[in-house]
Amino acid sequence: MKVLSVSSEVFPLIKTGGLADVSGALPIALKAFGVETKTLLPGYPAVMKVIRDPVVRLEFADLLGEKATVLEVEHEGLDLLVLHAPAYYDRPGGPYLDPLGKDYPDNWRRFAALSLAAAEIAAGLLPGWQPDLVHTHDWQAALTSVYMRYYPTPELPSVLTIHNIAFQGQFGSEIFPGLRLPGHAFAIDGVEYYGTTGFLKGGLQTAHAITTVSPTYADEILTPEFGMGLEGVIATRIDNLHGIVNGIDTDIWNPATDPVVHTHYGPTTLKNRDENRRSIAEFFHLDNDDAPIFCVISRLTWQKGMDLVANVADEIVAMGGKLVVLGSGEAALEGALLASASRHPGRIGVSIGYNEPMSHLMQAGCDAIIIPSRFEPCGLTQLYGLRYGCVPIVARTGGLNDTVIDANHAALAAKVATGIQFSPVTETGLLQAIRRAMHFYADRKLWTQLQKQGMKSDVSWEKSAERYAALYSSLVSKGM
């Protein structure tokens, strides 16, 4: 089976979040199930800088008003189609934001162009290659299925994956003519959304199947609390909605071989984590004692529940624990966490910014990782924690609920528990979870059981890829 994947970011070329991890890892995992994937992405400067010897496969004289070229290149096991359109993508800043952190005012055109190019490839414009199915990711690629509906193309099935419904690609009605869609596409069954132009909304209306990145999140986005205004649209597509948990690259995230981990280990050699623990204490200037080290590796935002962490930091120390934080985000939260470190030298350490090697070492040396997100479509950090024996303490929401088995009496008795869940997502709820962790940590046999069971969890892409391959096959066989 041949699949065209369309994404605004793909790891390892360009990444701002989990979207890149999925669009980079899933095509490789799908190979084992006979799926050949070509991935279309924008030719940002960071992408053009690293690709080598690309081949020109397609040229557009007028892609929504600008010239563009589709380049094909292989990169680290990925078959890439790079949309080289300097007028759209060759600019400073990131994929979506200018150097001042503001949205590019023409983001609607930049990603409509990506979607239109994808629809043209789906229609057979790429010489010698015709996909059987198109898989698009988030609002930036969601117009692909809209163009496929309204432009004369082969009847190809399409899948739209929602990684985070909070990002919807909603623009004013005045941009609609620039999309070059027929007038009747600006309607309730098209891109119109309360008088605006909705990219994700249009994709939800036109894709043959919709997936989210966990079963719980698929249920949550049907509710006003999590649906962000689109719950009504999604409810009309409930028969085509699927929740499939993300995986992680277990070759990159492997405590037995990870090059940045000071001392390698596995489920039967957990004692080797002690050296990594000492390295964490040294980096964060912590006292070198046996108190449990709780860690946070996160964007420091309200959505991630970081205000809760800041507010309970003193209590963690009072209970006899230590806390280390790695991340950046809202200035007020950064300041609150730094202030807690100043109040408790040797017990709390905070590093503002992101440090990929340190994130690996923290998973390999800390005792538990706190993930108190108010909503979390899937989450990857808890999967890294499971893999590394860093016991996850998670809010009972989204993918956190689907991937961490709470250490309740039944799960402990059956020896299947892998972490600690809490609800409601409040300071009180988080403190209760940390108290439970402290209680379990005092019983080293029980704590080791939690670590080992977590490390046995299958967090690879294999099961997820199998489910995607099955979904693809069902759509293609139905001739949708």
Curated annotation (Swiss-Prot):
What are the disulphide bonds in this sequence?
none
Q: Does the entry feature the keyword Transferase, yes or no?
A: yes
Group of enzyme by EC: transferase
| Keyword Glycosyltransferase recorded | yes
Which amino acids does the record list as binding ADP-alpha-D-glucose? K15
User: What does the UniProt function comment say about this protein?
Assistant: Synthesizes alpha-1,4-glucan chains using ADP-glucose.
The record's similarity note reads: Belongs to the glycosyltransferase 1 family. Bacterial/plant glycogen synthase subfamily.
What is the name of this protein? Glycogen synthase
What lineage is this protein's organism placed in? Bacteria, Pseudomonadati, Pseudomonadota, Alphaproteobacteria, Hyphomicrobiales
